[in-house]
């Protein structure tokens, strides 16, 4: 096939329609990224970036100046296409104000948002109009001259900027509104009896469906490239990934102290507001809640926004949008190549809780070991084990240990989860069994009663992580190198899809790992306690992964 024919195919696939979803914790820079993507590109950007900022990147990749030239040439030939900035929070705002009784409900502090309460009625009228446009007309064919929805959304955005105080109460309320919509659907806010749209069959996709209808309507008004600011629920992200082949998730990352400082200084949050908002962002126990860590780790492209200036963030966005529009425009960086190996390795994991991959690369750039979290050799992964097999096959099943086939554990399994074909997690069930036992002993000795709710919390606190059957991905990568005679790991780099726990961090320190690149941050003190111990000159560099991953 001729190069011109290939270009023609990509023009049709990548130039006519694309969606970028942004995800990241509050203060990481999702809105800043969306503004960059929605603005025109300064003609002098590439020269300015090359003169003042390129050297910082070139220290990490000797090919970056050549990538920059390729990107600049592509933009000169194809031109920069600005994205339509679609604020998901503004759409939630419309849905909320579409229902009069919700506005003055005690569950929300609506009156505290507004600088002038007289603006509420006008806001409600505008929001009702926007909801009607989206719900009634998204399937009808429009002409590009009719830009009623585009203009109404601009009017709404200006209305919010002028009249609304986006403080911590506003953020908390909108986290609550998002949860309500994902749990109960749109029916609490929108009357479907007189709409051409129907209520989504699964409530968790209620917001996704509304955004999809909005995009469909805006496409009929002539818009082609969209940036969604922002997605913070994994099911919503998976909805867009499944529906649109040209959907790309950009994970925007910034270190927590930087994010916190931005919220306190730039957004007027108070110190006591930060932890509750952070907790709501990382609720992994409910399908309808925000779960930033899961969203970030599912990114197609990972960006850093730790800098005080926007130029580096802007370069990253331009770079990956160009790659999105023309796959193969430039080759992967060393970090992208090696992290892709770690990402691929995780699919070998038979763990039913999470899948992690790791790759150790020597100082000369050669792979020394690959690993994934899984059980030791001669053991059967959890994904292939079930309580039915344990209970019914007596002691003849090779997938179970001598302890698991003992009466004490088998009887507990029979009473706790019964006989079924689903895999079970030994660590979780054994921790629960031992936890209940310890609480029963405590109550018997002290005579103190403990409620069932407190008991559940205590069991989680009493869990013992050493009961897990699997070795961690990092351990397996280290051991693979030792097993096959790969030589010293001193001054090597560890690529892992989840940052090391304390146990793996200690092993990395002992082996002399000099750099650790991760995607998903592990929620413990391993970085501060273990990796930043002793002579600071010998601390390994710990960095969040930047670049393209998975299918992007």
Give residue ranges: language-model regions.
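Extreme N-terminal, non-catalytic leader segments
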Residues: 1-26, 36-74
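Small-molecule kinase domains that catalyze NTP-dependent phosphoryl transfer to phosphate-bearing small molecules
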Residues: 6-7, 205, 237, 265-317
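Walker A/P-loop
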Residues: 31
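Short, acidic/turn-prone active-site loops that include or flank metal/cofactor-
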Residues: 48-58, 90, 252-258, 308, ...
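P-loop NTPase motor core
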Residues: 57-130
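Short, surface-exposed basic-aromatic patches at helix termini and helix-loop junctions that form
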Residues: 78, 238-248, 506-517
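Zinc-dependent deaminase catalytic domain
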Residues: 104-122, 126, 132-214, 218-219, ...
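Conserved phosphate-donor/acceptor-positioning beta-strand/loop module used by diverse small-molecule
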Residues: 229-231, 240-267
């Amino acid at each position: 096939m001729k190069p011109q024919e290939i270009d023609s195919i990509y023009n049709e696939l990548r130039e006519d329609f694309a969606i970028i979803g942004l995800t990241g914790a509050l203060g990481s820079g999702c809105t800043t990224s969306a503004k960059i993507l929605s603005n025109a590109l300064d003609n002098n950007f590439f020269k300015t970036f090359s003169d003042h900022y390129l050297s910082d990147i070139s220290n990490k990749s000797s090919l970056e100046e050549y990538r920059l030239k390729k990107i600049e040439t592509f933009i000169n030939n194809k031109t920069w296409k600005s994205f339509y900035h679609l604020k998901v929070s503004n759409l939630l705002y419309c849905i909320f104000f579409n229902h009069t009784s919700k506005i003055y409900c005690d569950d929300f502090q609506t009156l505290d948002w507004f600088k002038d309460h007289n603006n509420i009625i006008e806001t409600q009228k505008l929001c009702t109009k926007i909801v009607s446009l989206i719900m009634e007309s998204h399937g009808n064919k429009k002409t590009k001259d009719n830009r009623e929805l585009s203009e109404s959304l601009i009017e709404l955005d200006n209305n919010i900027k002028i009249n609304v105080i986006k403080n911590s109460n506003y953020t908390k309320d909108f986290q609550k509104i998002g949860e309500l919509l994902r749990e109960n659907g749109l029916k609490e806010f929108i009357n479907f009896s007189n709409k051409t749209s129907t209520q989504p069959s699964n409530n968790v996709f209620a917001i996704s469906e509304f955004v999809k209808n909005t995009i469909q309507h805006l496409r009929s008004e002539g818009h082609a490239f969209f940036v969604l600011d922002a997605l913070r629920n994994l099911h919503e992200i998976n909805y867009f990934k499944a529906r649109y082949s040209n959907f790309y998730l950009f994970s925007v990352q910034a270190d927590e102290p930087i994010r916190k400082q931005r919220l306190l200084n730039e957004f007027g949050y108070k110190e006591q507001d930060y932890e509750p908002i952070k907790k709501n962002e990382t609720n992994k126990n409910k399908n309808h809640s925000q779960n930033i860590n899961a969203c970030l780790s599912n990114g197609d492209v990972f960006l850093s926004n730790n800098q005080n200036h926007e130029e580096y963030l802007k370069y990253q966005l331009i770079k990956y949008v160009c790659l999105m529009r023309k796959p193969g425009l430039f080759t992967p960086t060393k970090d992208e190549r090696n992290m892709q190996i770690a990402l691929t390795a995780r699919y070998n994991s038979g763990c039913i809780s999470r899948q992690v991959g790791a790759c150790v690369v020597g100082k000369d750039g050669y792979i020394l070991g690959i690993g994934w979290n899984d059980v030791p050799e001669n053991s059967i992964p959890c994904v292939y084990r079930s309580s039915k097999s344990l209970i019914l096959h007596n002691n003849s099943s090779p997938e179970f240990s001598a302890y698991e086939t003992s009466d004490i554990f088998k009887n507990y399994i029979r009473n706790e989860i019964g006989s079924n074909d689903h895999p079970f997690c030994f660590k979780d069930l054994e921790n629960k069994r031992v936890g209940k036992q310890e609480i029963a002993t405590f109550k018997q000795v002290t005579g103190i009663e403990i409620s069932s709710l407190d008991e559940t919390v205590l069991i989680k606190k009493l869990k013992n992580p050493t009961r897990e059957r699997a070795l961690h991905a990092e351990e397996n990568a280290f051991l693979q190198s030792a097993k096959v005679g790969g030589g010293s790991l001193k001054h090597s780099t560890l690529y892992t899809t989840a940052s090391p726990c304390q146990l793996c961090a200690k092993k990395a320190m002992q082996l002399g790992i000099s750099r650790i690149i991760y995607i998903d941050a592990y929620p413990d003190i391993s970085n501060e306690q273990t990796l930043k111990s002793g002579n600071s000159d010998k601390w390994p560099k710990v960095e969040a992964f930047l670049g393209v991953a998975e299918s992007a």
